[in-house]
Design a protein with these regions (language model features):
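Metal-dependent nuclease catalytic cores that hydrolyze phosphodiester bonds in DNA/RNA
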Residues: 1-82, 107
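Mg2+/Mn2+-dependent nuclease catalytic core
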Residues: 57-153
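Conserved pre-motif I regulatory segment
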Residues: 171-214
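A substrate-engagement module of RecA-like helicase motors
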Residues: 178, 184, 237-344, 352, ...
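Walker A/P-loop
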Residues: 206-228
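Signature of the SF2 helicase/ATPase Hel1-core->accessory helical subdomain module
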Residues: 252, 326-343, 347-451, 532-546, ...
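A contiguous, basic/glycine-rich beta-loop/short-helix subdomain that forms a polymer-engagement track
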Residues: 319-339, 344, 355-361, 455-565, ...
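Conserved RecA-like P-loop NTPase helicase motor core
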Residues: 570-580, 626-737
Length: 753
């Protein structure tokens, strides 16, 4: 008999929830007050009362051969000999006492009452909802005595809708599993190493372990990871598969692999989650007073979900069309669908970022498999997720807007002033420097930042009197919330940085991505981190907190080495010599494209270096811009997809055109890489270098060389995409001949000079 666990709160909130989309308060003080209110009330209860009493009720769903185990903890329980009493404690912060209990709060108490009646055979039970202050003072108390039959009837009103959803999902699961059992690999033959990779992924899921895999570009990594994950899904080894990417452009490989698998009559709900602002059709404030889709969204989404469950194709177009049909917010609709989807393709953030990860999935269950594409990005991305800042200059600008719109007595204005004053009062070094590190922050600094975050959240809940400031509130709020979260973690994992002497920016900079990634993925149903540049594997596993029993797998290149001609030319591209190097670089590029006309991409360490060289390059070319939307990027690449013609493009190494794009055949004849890709020397990289020097013994390797050579390998990997592709890569830097850099190159590279 299969067992499914659900909490009392989850069951109740499935049916009893708000109608509108509203920002969850998220106030730090509210969360603290709620806990304190519970504890204070529990201490004030008399003799015989017990706090946080666990209670479970198994519910047999015979036709599904399923046992639904309902569980939770009663806030307070009096085990009286005649009629026991259940108390549900909630925080109340309203100006006036509540006139009646909130339906969802009352239903939670009723559910516990029903569970007691069933498990103890009681004829009746007392239930009450009590609203208290943070000190436990009662603001409202609503007692009831209910018979067992009354409890059962009310309980059924929330259980039956939930069971309807469960039955529908299980019907789909049976059809899905049958189709997955018959699923075959989407190509007639495996490429060399591809089958071994698939076995490794399947084993990682079965063992609930992590796998770190280096897979050369063009080896069919999407199929080699998705196929075994889907097989494991069909066998019940995992509940969902999340395919995570670092960039939107990298999703296409997964989508193409799924499309090919769907040709086998596959019953699979595969969902793509785009950024909220990208999906928004109205581009108004996400508030029921401003957006008709936000108003009443949750009254309409149940019907939309049920209709969506009747179709297999959950493409972005179909999800958007269903959201339009029911006047729903597309993003929130996708968030609801992700709870029952089989496969979800999304950005790293939705699984790993503590600020925006899908709590309804990753806080509620560990029965999820992660397939993490281009995983060499993870250390930097996780550092970004865990870091946060307080920008004094930005706060001053926003405070001016808030002051004009709402007045200087507004709580938000006052809270901003407190933080600005706290930043101004920091004791910075008197050596005239414009940036540096601080050993610690004053004791009251965190307090005023927490208060400002709460004031921000309150303002965002208001009917905004200042629409101009509305958007800026979010831009300032997110780094501040991240800063507050960072300050609650172990200070040993952070460095405190300051930038700008007049109006400083204070950053809590995360140093350790390994510990967080290890914790975030612990106990999941398999995690596969894969990339063409997850190399060297021992070092990358170390950076990502892998355990000794987490497997490493290096997939050999399936393509003949002679198909890629790699040539190195000694050019000094170091920062101090770049101006003089531009002429030689332009000469090398001209010689390459003149001797063998075709389609080429040239990658530079920076936009400044790119522009300097472009001025000396007497050839027609297209140049990557700093800001390019999807349409501009598509137009940029379209030149390569034309059947004929020569194309030369100048791009930035590590940008959108050096990773995640697929130009097979004669769409790309070669690449030129200028420099070895080292990150720019700045405060952040130097702090990282010092950290890795202390912890891993080689700061320059981990802070500079590894990320640099990963970008180089990705760029060169654009050339060979299929078994028949041939091409050239020109590496312009004398350091490519150094043993320390050669060790970081893929084993199949054969370099001539």
């Amino acid at each position: 008999m299969e067992e499914l666990r659900v909490s009392v709160r989850e069951l109740v909130e499935f049916t009893l929830h708000g109608a509108d989309i509203r920002l969850i308060s998220g106030r730090m003080q509210d969360m603290l007050d709620g806990t304190l209110g519970h504890q204070a009330r529990q201490k004030l209860l008399g003799d015989g009362w017990q706090a946080e009493v666990p209670l479970n009720l198994p519910i047999l769903v015979e036709e599904e051969e399923l046992t639904l185990v309902l569980g939770g903890r009663m806030d307070a329980f009096l085990d009286a000999p005649d009629i026991p009493c259940v108390e549900e404690i909630k925080l109340w912060q309203g100006e006036h006492p509540p006139e009646a209990p909130i339906p969802a709060h009352r239903m939670q108490a009723v559910c516990y009452g029903h569970m007691l009646c069933v498990t103890r055979g009681l004829p009746a039970v007392d239930v009450r909802v009590v609203y208290v202050t943070r000190r436990g003072k009662v603001q409202g108390e609503f007692p009831e005595r209910l018979t067992a039959e009354e409890c059962r009837a009310e309980f059924q009103s929330v259980l039956l809708p939930y069971l309807r959803r469960i039955r529908a999902v299980r019907r789909h699961t049976r059809a899905r599993n049958a189709s997955l059992a018959a699923l075959k690999f989407p190509y007639a033959n495996y490429r060399p190493g591809q089958r071994e990779m698939a076995v490794q992924v399947y084993t990682a899921i079965k063992r609930k372990k992590r796998l770190f895999a280096c897979m050369p570009t063009g080896t069919g990594k999407s199929s080699a990871t998705l196929f075994p994950a889907l097989k494991a899904l069909g066998e019940g080894l995992t509940g969902q598969v999340y395919y995570l990417t670092a960039r939107t452009t990298q999703r296409q490989g997964a989508l193409d692999a799924l499309a090919r698998l769907h040709q086998q009559t596959l019953h699979l709900w595969a969902l793509v989650i785009d950024a909220k602002d990208k999906q928004c059709p109205t581009h108004t404030l996400c508030h029921p007073d401003y957006c008709e889709r936000a108003k009443g969204h949750f009254l309409r989404d149940t019907d939309a979900i049920e209709e969506m469950m009747n179709i297999d194709d959950w493409s972005a177009e179909n999800v958007r069309a269903m959201a339009d049909k029911y006047c729903l917010c597309p993003f929130e609709f996708a968030m609801s669908l992700c709870e029952i989807a089989d496969v979800v393709i999304c950005d790293y953030n939705y699984a790993l970022d503590p600020a925006v990860h899908i709590r309804r999935i990753f806080d509620a269950t560990r029965d999820v498999t992660l397939l993490i594409d281009e995983a060499h990005h993870l250390p930097e991305r996780i550092r970004d997720m865990l870091s946060g800042s307080v920008d004094s200059a930005g706060l001053r600008k926003l405070r001016t807007v808030v002051g004009k719109a709402a007045g200087k007595k507004h709580p938000l204005y006052k809270a901003m002033t407190d933080v600005i004053r706290a930043v101004d009062n920091l004791l910075l070094p008197e050596d005239g420097s414009q940036e540096g590190t601080l050993p610690k922050l004053p004791d009251d600094f965190d307090r005023v930042c927490l208060s400002l975050a709460d004031a921000f959240m309150d303002a965002r809940q208001e009917h905004f009197p200042w629409e101009d400031a509305g958007g800026r509130l979010g831009d300032t709020l997110m780094p501040l919330l991240s800063f507050n979260r960072a300050r609650q973690r172990d200070s040993a994992d952070y460095a405190i940085l300051w930038e700008g002497r007049r109006h400083p920016k204070i950053t809590a900079f995360a140093l350790d991505s390994a510990g967080y990634f290890q914790q975030a993925t612990q106990g999941l149903s398999g995690v596969t981190c894969f990339s063409a540049t997850l190399h060297p594997l021992p070092e990358m596993r170390l950076l990502l907190g892998g355990a000794e029993d987490d497997a490493c797998f290096a997939m050999p290149s399936p393509f003949p080495p002679e198909h890629l001609q790699i040539r190195q030319v000694d050019v000094n591209t170091r920062y101090a010599h770049r101006s003089s190097a531009c002429t030689e670089i332009a000469r090398q590029i001209t010689a390459l494209v003149t001797q063998k006309p075709g389609k080429y991409l040239v990658f530079f360490p920076s936009f400044a270096f790119l522009r300097m060289t472009a001025e000396r390059l007497m050839l027609p070319c297209q140049v990557q811009e700093k800001q390019m939307d999807e349409a501009a990027r598509a137009a940029f690449l379209m030149a390569y997809r034309q059947e004929s013609g020569n194309v030369l493009s100048l791009c930035v190494l590590g940008g959108v055109f050096s990773e995640g794009i697929d130009l097979p055949g004669r769409q790309l004849d070669g690449v030129v890489v200028v420099g070895v890709g080292l990150p720019q020397v700045n405060l952040y990289q130097e702090v990282l270098r010092a950290h890795f020097e202390r912890t891993l013994g080689d700061g320059f390797l981990y802070a500079y060389m590894l990320p640099g050579m990963q970008k180089v390998t990705q760029a060169v990997g654009r050339v060979i995409r299929t078994e028949t592709d041939t091409g050239v890569a020109l590496l312009l830097d004398d350091r490519y001949s150094y043993p320390a850099y050669r060790r970081l190159m893929p084993e199949h590279w054969r370099i001539s000079r």
